[in-house]
Design a protein with these regions (language model features):
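Short, thiol/selenol-centered motifs that function as redox-active sites or metal-ligating centers
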Residues: 15-21
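Short, well-ordered, aromatic-rich surface patches in folded extracellular/luminal domains
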Residues: 1-15, 42-124
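Short, flexible N-terminal segments of the mature chain
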Residues: 21-40
Length: 124
């Protein structure tokens, strides 16, 4: 069931051996970017947010698994690889939470590109 007028959530954080790169949608068309130990609050355009949601639908992000890798590895992992977390909820209440360690869903890089377009960030 979808609930109308839910608080939108766009949150991504990814890190390896360096401090995390994080983007987050705040209230009143504001966004937060944390990268290279810098903290910026920016103004976002409504049309860019709507375009982002269109791309999320096109990419099939709502169908991504909750965890990557989907299967638990047989060997214990070293913790020096890339770890990421994504939280989304559109204005209709459709939500997705997923995370991963050194494993990524299909179209992950395109989704990162769309986050960079929305926030003006440089997540790699």
């Amino acid at each position: 069931m979808l609930l109308k007028n839910k608080k939108e959530i766009i949150y991504y954080s990814g890190f390896s051996m360096e401090p995390p790169e994080t983007v987050e949608l705040l209230d009143n068309l504001k966004g937060k970017i944390i990268s290279n130990r810098t903290h910026k609050i920016i103004k976002l355009e409504e049309y860019k947010i709507l375009s982002f949601w269109d791309k999320i639908n096109e990419l099939g992000v709502w169908n991504w698994s909750k965890k990557y890798p989907v299967k638990e590895p047989e060997l214990e992992q070293l913790l020096d690889g890339y770890r990421w977390e994504l939280k989304l909820r559109d204005r209709n209440g459709k939500a997705k939470y997923c995370s991963g360690y050194m494993s990524f869903p299909r179209n992950f890089n395109v989704m990162i590109k769309e986050l960079n377009i929305l926030f003006g960030s440089n997540i790699k």
